[in-house]
């Protein structure tokens, strides 16, 4: 098998034309003959490049509104022909070898994402000739280079220059892998789209079956290998979606520190997603995927100081997330006060990075500013299966709350209730959060009984000398018994926010009235397992 193959003839047919003119110019300048189709050929000709239309090469016109362009033996024979083995038959049928295929596919994902996209629109954006050429070239990678990503254009030209116009087998093989990944992802999108429409298509319903197709095809790209997984005996890697539309741990840039661990990434995700809930300057400190301190204030420095005070013991070795730029003063406060694994923020000032650089092991990530939250899917692996659900983006405002007790909450109690309700959404169930003056003062997480989460929150507040009297308490789900209210009242809580919906709601409300507690129902639950 020849290790290097000279590139003498290339076929270019792309939907995404970013960089294609410059790439074609570079190929042409190196003596490569250009074949092309449709809009790509017109663009290259407009730029003064010598290009042969595929229809002129095959002697067969494009037809059926462009549905049939490249499905021809002179095209696929030129791609699939085995050099040194099929030369005679190629010569007999006047088939010229094609050494490089540059193809990206019709924008199916963008089409079906458009509001009002019809089935007909989707069908017309299913590429046939493109994937066929991609697979043909990838199959024959020992002789042909297949290019599906514009990000590879520069590297390909450089390698050709380093190898007298040739590409190595290693490069062709790597490009083939990318090509098969590309077509697999493309077919998966189409299968998912049509799979979700089966009932509607067969006339069983006028509505689509929903966002859950009968076969779920997922495509993620490996971002990095991990030293190990959740535990040292487990191997692990981090995979991300190709086109993430929201600032996240997956899109974040690490600007300082040693490599992220599996647990670092999981905890950073928990911290970042929580801090996104707040419009005011906010700080979230997470340990083992649970918030251990959260606060909002007029500055991230004060927010950090108050979040830290919730539970300094748990904050040791934690993950810290901000929703504003990390500044020098805040960075200095963190470094001077505690050991921290990861700091993530939309951005970080140069001065802040100089300060954190003094602690080389501290990982600093910037993720960019986020806008509206993007709907998507959450996954949970079970043995032999996968649970899939919509992301929990639900959140209630003050106008949606129902006061179910005799006493109305004060303005501050209401603010604190809404604040700790946002935090409770990110605490493992059973979740109880005590808050006062826009900071958490006690968090009870992950207990099997709700009353013990309430007791733990009170114990934590007492241990840190934080006053519970006049505070608000959030519960991620309803109280099955009044004991959780009794525990909160004993600690000093005066306002409770919870979903409601228990068969014993009357008893729970009565307990609140007995203690003079204001109680708010959200009619929305936030279990987190």
Swiss-Prot record:
Q: Does the keyword DNA-binding apply?
A: no
Q: Where would I find the MGS-like domain in this sequence?
A: 1-148
Q: Which UniProt keywords apply?
A: Acetylation, Hydrolase, Multifunctional enzyme, Purine biosynthesis, Transferase
Q: Which reaction does it catalyse?
A: (6R)-10-formyltetrahydrofolate + 5-amino-1-(5-phospho-beta-D-ribosyl)imidazole-4-carboxamide = 5-formamido-1-(5-phospho-D-ribosyl)imidazole-4-carboxamide + (6S)-5,6,7,8-tetrahydrofolate; IMP + H2O = 5-formamido-1-(5-phospho-D-ribosyl)imidazole-4-carboxamide
> Which residues does the record list as N6-acetyllysine (modified residue)?
287
Give the molecular function GO annotations: IMP cyclohydrolase activity; phosphoribosylaminoimidazolecarboxamide formyltransferase activity
- Keyword Hydrolase, does the record have it? yes
Q: Report one GO cellular component.
A: cytosol
Superkingdom of the organism of origin: Bacteria
Q: Name one GO biological process term.
A: 'de novo' IMP biosynthetic process
| PROSITE patterns assigned to the protein according to its UniProt record, in alphabetical order | MGS
Known EC number? 2.1.2.3, 3.5.4.10
Entry-linked InterPro entries: AICAR_Tfase_dup_dom_sf, Cytidine_deaminase-like, MGS-like_dom, MGS-like_dom_sf, PurH-like
The record, for NCBIfam families, names: PRK00881.1, purH
**Regarding domains, what does the record say?**
The IMP cyclohydrolase activity resides in the N-terminal region.
HAMAP family from the xrefs?
PurH
The entry sums up its family as follows: Belongs to the PurH family.
Name this protein carries in UniProt: Bifunctional purine biosynthesis protein PurH
Query: What does the record give as the organism's lineage?
Result: Bacteria, Pseudomonadati, Pseudomonadota, Gammaproteobacteria, Enterobacterales
**What gene does this protein come from?**
purH
């Amino acid at each position: 098998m020849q290790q290097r193959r000279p590139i003498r003839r290339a076929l270019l047919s792309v939907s995404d034309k970013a960089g294609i003119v410059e790439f074609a110019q570079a190929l042409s300048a190196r003596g490569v003959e250009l074949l092309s189709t449709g809009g790509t050929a017109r663009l290259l000709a407009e730029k003064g490049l010598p290009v042969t239309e595929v229809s002129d090469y095959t002697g067969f016109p494009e037809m059926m509104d462009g549905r049939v362009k490249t499905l021809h033996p002179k095209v696929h024979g030129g791609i699939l022909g085995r050099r040194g083995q099929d030369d005679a038959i190629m010569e007999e049928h006047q088939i010229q070898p094609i050494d490089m295929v540059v193809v990206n596919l019709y924008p199916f994902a963008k089409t079906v994402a458009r509001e009002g996209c019809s089935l007909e629109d989707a069908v017309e954006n299913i590429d046939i000739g493109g994937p066929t050429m991609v697979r043909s070239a990838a199959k024959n990678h020992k002789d042909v280079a297949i290019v599906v990503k514009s990000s590879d254009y520069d590297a390909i030209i450089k390698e050709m220059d380093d190898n007298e116009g040739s590409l190595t087998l290693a490069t062709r093989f790597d490009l083939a892998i990318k090509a098969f990944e590309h077509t697999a992802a493309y077919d998966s999108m189409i299968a998912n789209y049509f799979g979700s429409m089966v009932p509607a298509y067969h006339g069983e319903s006028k509505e689509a079956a929903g966002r859950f197709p009968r076969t779920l095809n997922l495509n993620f790209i490996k971002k990095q290998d991990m030293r190990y997984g959740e535990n040292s005996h487990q191997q692990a890697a981090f995979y991300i979606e190709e086109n993430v539309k929201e600032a996240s741990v997956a899109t974040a840039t690490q600007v300082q520190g040693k490599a992220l661990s599996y647990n670092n990434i999981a905890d950073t995700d928990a911290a970042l997603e929580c801090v996104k809930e707040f419009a005011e300057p906010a700080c979230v400190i997470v340990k083992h995927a649970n918030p251990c301190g959260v606060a909002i204030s007029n500055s991230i420095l004060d927010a950090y100081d108050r979040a830290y005070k919730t539970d300094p013991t748990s904050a040791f070795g934690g993950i810290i997330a901000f929703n504003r730029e990390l500044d020098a003063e805040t960075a200095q406060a963190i470094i001077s006060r505690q050991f921290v694994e990861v700091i993530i923020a939309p951005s970080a000032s140069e001065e802040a990075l100089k300060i954190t650089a003094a602690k080389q092991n501290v990982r600093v990530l910037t993720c960019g500013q986020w806008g509206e939250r993007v709907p998507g899917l959450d996954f949970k692996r079970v043995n032999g299966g996968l649970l899939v659900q919509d992301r929990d983006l639900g959140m209630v405002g003050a106008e949606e709350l129902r006061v179910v007790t005799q006493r109305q909450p004060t303005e501050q109690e209401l603010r604190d209730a809404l604040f700790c309700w946002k935090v409770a959404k990110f605490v493992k169930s059973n979740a109880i959060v005590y808050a006062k003056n826009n900071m958490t003062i006690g968090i009870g997480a992950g207990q099997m009984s709700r009353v013990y989460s309430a007791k733990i929150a009170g114990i934590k507040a007492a241990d840190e000398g934080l006053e519970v009297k006049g505070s608000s308490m959030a519960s991620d789900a309803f109280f099955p018994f009044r004991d959780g209210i009794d525990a909160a009242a004993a600690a000093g809580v005066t306002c409770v926010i919870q979903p409601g919906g228990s068969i014993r709601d009357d008893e729970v409300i009565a307990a609140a009235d007995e203690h003079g507690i204001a109680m708010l129902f959200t009619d929305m639950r936030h279990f987190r397992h």
